[in-house]
Amino acid sequence: MPELPEVEVTRLGITPHVLHQTVTDIVIRNGRLRWPIPDDINQIKQQPITKVRRRAKYLLLDTPVGSAIVHLGMSGSLRVLPAGTAPEKHDHVDLALSSGEILRYNDPRRFGAWLWQPVDTKHHVLAKLGPEPLTDVFTADYLQQKAKGKRTAIKQFIMDNHIVVGVGNIYANESLFSAGIHPQKAAGEVTPQALTVLVDEIKAVLAFAIQQGGTTLKDFKNADGKPGYFAQELQVYGKGGLPCPKCGTELAEVKIGQRATVYCSQCQQ
């Protein structure tokens, strides 16, 4: 599933092609995604795209009358292609642009979404999200206040979008390993010093993943159709039973909140 770095890489890739371009048409071949594509999204026709934003794992294409909200789901991708490029299987949505290019959405599993947010409103999917991890709002003090008294495992805690957005399973595993924190430790029992390190590591891991073009394990490709290379940098995710890269201890694998969790029993306390 594309996580924050993959969505940010997509945003960076499409922005030079779509920013300040007018949407001349929208072609919906299959509107049955995670939620049905609303008819209101046709309001984007003949509107200029004034900004391309990311909020959590949602991309927003802003226009003067509203924003198209795009979620890549489990297997979605956006690519910029020349006009007239024949659609392939699972190419569900095209935005035709005044430049002569098209922004094409492909989603084999159809767990993604295209939604519409009228101007000066906030769609319910965005209403209760926590802060962005790569901003100054996400600090150790903030995380400490939220964690106070919480018995939830720290891994589940940092994956909660109401606490902080965009720390998906891959990056939660990697950040906790880098910070030396056991993923099953209660969030309220993590010391302020350890939370400071964790915040720094979350920021560092996400920033490096973006720099590497995201993580391609199966489906993800960027706007140029290329995979991300952060998978080559993974230290623990997907490596249960292998030696810890720091101490050589066999990495343990458990389920936390039904998600695969890999950690080192020696390095993470």
From Swiss-Prot:
Q: Where does DNA bind?
A: 90, 109, 150
Q: Which reaction does it catalyse?
A: Hydrolysis of DNA containing ring-opened 7-methylguanine residues, releasing 2,6-diamino-4-hydroxy-5-(N-methyl)formamidopyrimidine; 2'-deoxyribonucleotide-(2'-deoxyribose 5'-phosphate)-2'-deoxyribonucleotide-DNA = a 3'-end 2'-deoxyribonucleotide-(2,3-dehydro-2,3-deoxyribose 5'-phosphate)-DNA + a 5'-end 5'-phospho-2'-deoxyribonucleoside-DNA + H(+)
In terms of CDD domains, this protein maps to: EcFpg-like_N (cd08966)
Q: Where is the active site?
A: 2 (schiff-base intermediate with dna), 3 (proton donor), 57 (proton donor), 259 (proton donor)
Annotated Pfam families: Fapy_DNA_glyco, H2TH, zf-FPG_IleRS
Biological role: Involved in base excision repair of DNA damaged by oxidation or by mutagenic agents. Acts as a DNA glycosylase that recognizes and removes damaged bases. Has a preference for oxidized purines, such as 7,8-dihydro-8-oxoguanine (8-oxoG). Has AP (apurinic/apyrimidinic) lyase activity and introduces nicks in the DNA strand. Cleaves the DNA backbone by beta-delta elimination to generate a single-strand break at the site of the removed base with both 3'- and 5'-phosphates.
- The EC number(s) given in the record are 3.2.2.23, 4.2.99.18
Q: By its UniProt entry, which Gene3D superfamilies does this protein fall under?
A: 1.10.8.50, MutM-like, N-terminal
Q: What cystine pairs are annotated? A: none
Is Cell wall biogenesis/degradation found in the keyword set? Answer: no
Assembly mode: Monomer.
State the Gene Ontology terms under molecular function. 8-oxo-7,8-dihydroguanine DNA N-glycosylase activity; class I DNA-(apurinic or apyrimidinic site) endonuclease activity; damaged DNA binding; zinc ion binding
Q: Zinc finger spans (FPG-type)?
A: 235-269
Q: Mind listing the UniProt keywords for this protein, alphabetically? A: DNA damage, DNA repair, DNA-binding, Glycosidase, Hydrolase, Lyase, Metal-binding, Multifunctional enzyme, Zinc, Zinc-finger
Query: Which superkingdom?
Result: Bacteria
What are the BP-aspect GO terms? base-excision repair
Q: Which family does it belong to?
A: Belongs to the FPG family.
The coenzyme or cofactor needed here is:
Zn(2+)
- Co-factor: note: Binds 1 zinc ion per subunit.
Which PANTHER family does the UniProt record give? FORMAMIDOPYRIMIDINE-DNA GLYCOSYLASE
What is the official name of this protein in its record?
Formamidopyrimidine-DNA glycosylase
